[in-house]
UniProtKB/Swiss-Prot annotation:
It comes from Arabidopsis thaliana. Ubiquitin-like modifier involved in autophagosomes formation. May mediate the delivery of the autophagosomes to the vacuole via the microtubule cytoskeleton. GO terms for biological process: autophagy; cellular response to starvation; protein transport; response to ethanol. This is Autophagy-related protein 8e. It comes from the Eukaryota. The C-terminal 4 residues are removed by ATG4 to expose Gly-118 at the C-terminus. This Gly-118 forms then a thioester bond with the 'Cys-558' of ATG7 (E1-like activating enzyme) before being transferred to the 'Cys-258' of ATG3 (the specific E2 conjugating enzyme), in order to be finally amidated with phosphatidylethanolamine. This lipid modification anchors ATG8 to autophagosomes. PANTHER family: MICROTUBULE-ASSOCIATED PROTEINS 1A/1B LIGHT CHAIN 3-RELATED (PTHR10969). Interacts with ATG4. Interacts with SH3P2. Interacts with ATG1A and ATG11. Binds to ATG1A and ATG11 on autophagic vesicles. Residues 119-122 form a propeptide. It is found in: Cytoplasmic vesicle, Autophagosome membrane; Vacuole membrane; Cytoplasm, Cytoskeleton. Belongs to the ATG8 family. InterPro entries: Atg8-like, Ubiquitin-like_domsf. A lipid is attached at G118 (Phosphatidylethanolamine amidated glycine).
Amino acid sequence: MNKGSIFKMDNDFEKRKAEAGRIREKYPDRIPVIVEKAEKSEVPNIDKKKYLVPSDLTVGQFVYVIRKRIKLSAEKAIFIFVDNVLPPTGELMSSVYEDKKDEDGFLYITYSGENTFGASSI
């Protein structure tokens, strides 16, 4: 897992918090998500880190979005982690956001080709 989010390192807390606040105000039915690859993962890098995710999207549907963005073939596995935990694929992104959003207002998701942290769920 990343020692720290690159997005967090590149943008100070106040800037991130203000941006997430603006996003939530302008798009109340969307969730501001930052997606980053796990440090030692062999899967491809994602072309874009910031996403505005519909609240009613499931974790499984968002995994599909990530798969498409990194052009991962169907036979390769991908795992996403929120706070080093694998969220249930059927859970709504809005629920994960409410439980696990960062104090800056973003939800941070790390993806990997390996199940690095075991199979525990949120």
